[in-house]
């Protein structure tokens, strides 16, 4: 819990942009999650710096979320301060050609921006949900193409240094759905992407193709968190889950999708406990049936049950 003194500090710094006991089900793509002690939405870098300083001084646990994809928030909620950078929406074309985007810009906005200008390189990201900050931290991608292939540099701040530091991505260690090499408490605030000059028609054609494919192969009409498990080397988590006979498996309001078995959908009223039960069931059944131990891609956030 956050004491009254810390609450006053947060309100003084952010005003109405901090909410207490904020239900996280309203801020995650799965529409699941108990309350955060505080949900803070800084308007700019100055407010973010003030917020990080308060968290440091008051020893408040902090959690960064983007658009709420790729995370499962516990039914008991999240301790401390949840920070969302959705007001960090700067987006502009720069020489190179490159595109500068702040952490709160949505993936779809960047894709549209590049398409309109005939800039090629980000087509693979079409339809991948989330925000720039989240993509970079997750090294989001599809097939052999990931964020590390287009991100030239990124900007971040820390609790100890609230002045933005720029780091070349070539100096960082990108892995499968992860980024290593930044300070543990780093908050990504921007990224610069290296692109190529193409034509609007060519870029749009590829974007449309990928969007059509995703629409046909993913359950986009129900709340989900995206891929639940990482793909094992040389195989696909969805194929293994389907082979284990788990398509359509339900616990409470949660279901392993029959459209794409690596998605768990909230059909209405699902709890985090329901999703966790399906995750454990899938891991057990796939291990028994296929001899493969699945690793989660979705991040489990909040108070343990």
Task: Place the predicted regions along the sequence by residue.
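Structural signature of FAD isoalloxazine-binding scaffolds in flavoprotein oxidoreductases
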Residues: 33-34, 40-45, 72-90, 136-170, ...
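A generic local secondary-structure boundary/capping motif
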Residues: 70-71, 111-114, 122-126, 136-146, ...
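Short, flexible micro-motifs
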Residues: 36, 69-73, 107, 133-137, ...
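Conserved active-site and cofactor/substrate-binding residues in soluble primary-metabolism enzymes
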Residues: 5, 25, 43-46, 105, ...
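Anion-binding (especially nucleotide phosphate/pyrophosphate-binding) glycine-rich loop
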Residues: 2-132
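Phosphate/pyrophosphate- and phosphate-bearing ligand-binding catalytic cores of soluble enzymes
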Residues: 19-20, 71, 157-277, 281-305
């Amino acid at each position: 819990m956050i004491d009254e003194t810390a609450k006053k500090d947060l309100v003084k710094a952010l005003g109405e942009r901090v909410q207490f006991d904020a239900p996280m089900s309203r801020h995650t793509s799965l529409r699941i999650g108990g309350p955060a002690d505080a949900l803070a939405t800084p308007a700019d870098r100055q407010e973010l710096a003030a917020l990080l300083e308060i968290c440091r001084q008051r020893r408040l646990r902090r959690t960064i979320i983007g658009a709420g994809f790729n995370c499962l928030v516990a039914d008991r909620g999240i301790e401390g301060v949840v920070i969302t950078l959705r007001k960090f929406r700067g987006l502009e074309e720069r020489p190179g050609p490159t595109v500068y985007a702040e952490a709160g810009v949505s993936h779809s906005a960047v894709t549209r921006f590049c398409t309109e200008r005939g800039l090629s390189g980000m087509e693979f990201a079409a339809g991948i949900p989330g925000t720039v900050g989240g993509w970079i931290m997750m090294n989001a991608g599809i097939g052999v193409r990931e964020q590390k292939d287009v991100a030239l540099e990124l900007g971040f701040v820390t609790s100890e240094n609230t002045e933005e530091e720029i780091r070349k991505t070539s100096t960082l260690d990108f892995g499968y759905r992860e980024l290593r090499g930044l300070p543990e408490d780093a908050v990504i605030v921007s990224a610069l992407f290296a692109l190529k000059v193409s034509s609007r028609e060519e870029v749009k054609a590829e974007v449309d193709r990928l969007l059509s494919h995703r629409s046909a192969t993913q359950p986009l009409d129900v709340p989900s968190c995206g891929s639940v498990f990482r793909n094992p080397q040389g195989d696909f988590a969805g194929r293994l889950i389907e082979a284990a006979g788990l398509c359509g498996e339900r616990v409470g309001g949660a279901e392993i999708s029959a459209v794409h078995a690596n998605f768990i959908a909230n059909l209405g009223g699902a709890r985090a406990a329901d999703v966790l039960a399906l995750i454990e069931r899938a891991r057990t059944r796939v291990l028994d049936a296929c001899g493969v131990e699945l690793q989660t891609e979705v991040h489990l956030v909040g108070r343990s049950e």
